[in-house]
Amino acid sequence: METHLYYDTLYQYQGGVYPAHICLPTDAYLPMRVDCIESLYFRCVFFKNGMHYTEWSKLKFTVISREIKFKDVLKNADFDELFTGLVVMTIPIPIVDFHFDIDSVILKLVYPQLVHREIVLRLYDLICIRPSSDRPSEVSAKNIGIDFYQLTSQGNKQTPDEEKRCLFFQQGPLEPPSTVRGLKAAGNAKPMQFPAHVNEKMTESFLSDSWFEQKVRCKKILDFTQTYRVVVCWYELSFSREMQIENNLLSASQLKRVNAADFWDRTDRYLRDIGSRVLTHIVKTLQIHNRQFKQKFNCNFPVNFSFEHLLSFMQLGKDFWILNLTLDSCIIKAIICFLGFRNGRKSFLAQDEVWGDLIDCSKGSVIYGEKIQWILDSTNNLYSTRREKQNKSWELYVDCCALYVSEKLELDFVLPGGFAITGKFALTDGDIDFFNWRFGLS
């Protein structure tokens, strides 16, 4: 893997980091194919009198969007599984006082339309792949010192062949002593004879050559939630083999103060909080308008359509929406856009687009975080909606509701018949703190 070779060499001279060489295979649990990944980020979680999160750092990566076996690239790899696609990367883990009981690495995958997936990996699984019984031989240890771009393994010292050829180009006078340039007539001087150059067998060893001939140990690991597969690679010639890494055990009292699932627990608490606030905002907005609905979207409804019918759909839609609320929700994406736009980032949506959660009350299912286009009909001043892979506007389905949020945090909860409860969602300092921690936004 050229990507692993490049970053192993880079981090060797950078110092202070452990290179975790990993591959992320195409997985059924990933939302899209690996070649759809727009960017990768990582952060580490260390124990420092509590849970300490490093800042998000962007990762370079290589995508292999074809069938591949490790042995096709690394012939001495101990892994022969066939993958339909891979994302190859190296995570530079800072060398600190490690606590394998609690330390972890979080890998963030960013897809189109602000779809994020986080993969939490135990630090122990990433670092402890190296066999404890393996030790570098003298030959292998010598190869580790070879520079990636070095032409020979002898530094600036010339090879015997180079010394032989340089004898004919030694510095000296242009003419013999006592010769005045231009006064001596040209004679029939015998031309200088150069010995024929004989190609000698190359005996030099290059790291870029030996990298693909070395022993490679590969191991499949699962993330913290036992959902995603990751392949960790250990290379015999990696500079990390010489590192002495110690595990600092936590005492019983220290373990009581930390939570290995802190990353997920904080996220779940926030989702429950913001979901409750959105629903409270909808109810209060309805009360402010004396429980009156205004039709905003273009669709027909039965003559016997009652107010109680709308209220029952409103309650049902709210319950289904909050039941499986995720970070893909329109409210989360709208806040990301709002904070990003405030910090000078470009808009993710066109002027006539919003983020939408589409609620199907007949099935009890929700499609979260869709990009929705609003189309205004000038004849009746009502909107129709459009989204990819859907020919029929969502408001035309009689048993469906929708929640729409714009990049300005303008919120619409749409009921059957195109009736909408419209308001504007307000952020708190807690929202800003959460998005700065979770997404690197503020």
Swiss-Prot record:
Keywords carried by this UniProt record: Capsid protein, Host nucleus, Late protein, Viral genome packaging, Viral release from host cell, Virion
InterPro entries, per database record: UL17-like (IPR007640)
The organism's place on the tree of life at top rank: Viruses
Keyword Protease among record annotations: no
Subcellular localization(s) per the UniProt record: Virion; Host nucleus
Keyword check for Repressor: no
Primary localization: virion
GO biological process: chromosome organization
One Gene Ontology CC term in the entry: host cell nucleus
Family the UniProt entry places it in: Belongs to the herpesviridae CVC1 protein family.
Subunit structure: Interacts (via C-terminus) with capsid vertex component 2/CVC2.
Function of the protein: Capsid vertex-specific component that plays a role during viral DNA encapsidation, assuring correct genome cleavage and presumably stabilizing capsids that contain full-length viral genomes.
Annotated protein name in UniProt: Capsid vertex component 1
Lineage: Viruses, Duplodnaviria, Heunggongvirae, Peploviricota, Herviviricetes
